[in-house]
Amino acid sequence: MKFFVDTADVKEIRELNDLGLLDGVTTNPSLILKSGRDIVEVTKEICSIVEGPVSAEVTATEYSEMMKEAAALSRIADNICIKLPLTLDGLKACKALTSDGHHTNVTLCFSANQALLAAKAGATFVSPFIGRLDDIAFDGMDLIREIRQIFDNYGYETEILAASIRTVNHVKEAALIGADVVTAPPATLKALVKHPLTDKGLEMFLADWAKTGQKIG
């Protein structure tokens, strides 16, 4: 499974990348706003930190304007992945961009039907939103399961990028079901390492080692 981080915070991206955990980055207009930086400036810096795909989202809603914005975003760096909304215009742009050799991430997916359309449009990634479905009492993992079965049935190469990940359990469940990628906030990715028995065991080992009076090296 690939791990993407969902942030435009360069400090957090550097830290996770140095740990060897990152396969890519996803951003959106809300995260750019939170960063307080110019979209081109911050996206270019992010692309210089990670080798994997960096999703940068268009804000236009009409096909022709989407294509103009996609052209501008793609000039930022070679590892830009154009993020598009799951609308008819977004799918049309996805097809055109994919045919032209660009990587694409079709976002705001909330149904298996939508995911199927994204795959048919040639999307590199489709991003089903887990947490937001949970908010309306729909099990987001059921959606991942449905998409996985459909893609496997027909051999679609579009990767399932589980988004709106809010807990470490979301990560585990997405991995068990077969999502290709999860994108999560920095805090959630860091929390994956935590377990109380790990902390307790380390504390015990260090206490016992101190009693030996020895040093290594």
Curated annotation (Swiss-Prot):
Pfam families: TAL_FSA. It is an enzyme of class 2 (transferase). SUPFAM superfamilies: Aldolase. One of its GO terms (molecular function) is transaldolase activity. NCBIfam families: fsa_talC_mipB. Keywords: Cytoplasm, Pentose shunt, Schiff base, Transferase. It catalyses: D-sedoheptulose 7-phosphate + D-glyceraldehyde 3-phosphate = D-erythrose 4-phosphate + beta-D-fructose 6-phosphate. It is found in: Cytoplasm. It comes from the Bacteria. Belongs to the transaldolase family. Type 3B subfamily. GO terms for biological process: carbohydrate metabolic process; pentose-phosphate shunt. HAMAP family: Transaldolase_3b (MF_00494). PROSITE patterns: TRANSALDOLASE_1 (PS01054), TRANSALDOLASE_2 (PS00958). The keyword Repeat does not apply. Pathway: Carbohydrate degradation; pentose phosphate pathway; D-glyceraldehyde 3-phosphate and beta-D-fructose 6-phosphate from D-ribose 5-phosphate and D-xylulose 5-phosphate (non-oxidative stage): step 2/3. Its EC number is 2.2.1.2. The active site is at K83. GO terms for cellular component: cytoplasm. Transaldolase is important for the balance of metabolites in the pentose-phosphate pathway. This is Probable transaldolase.
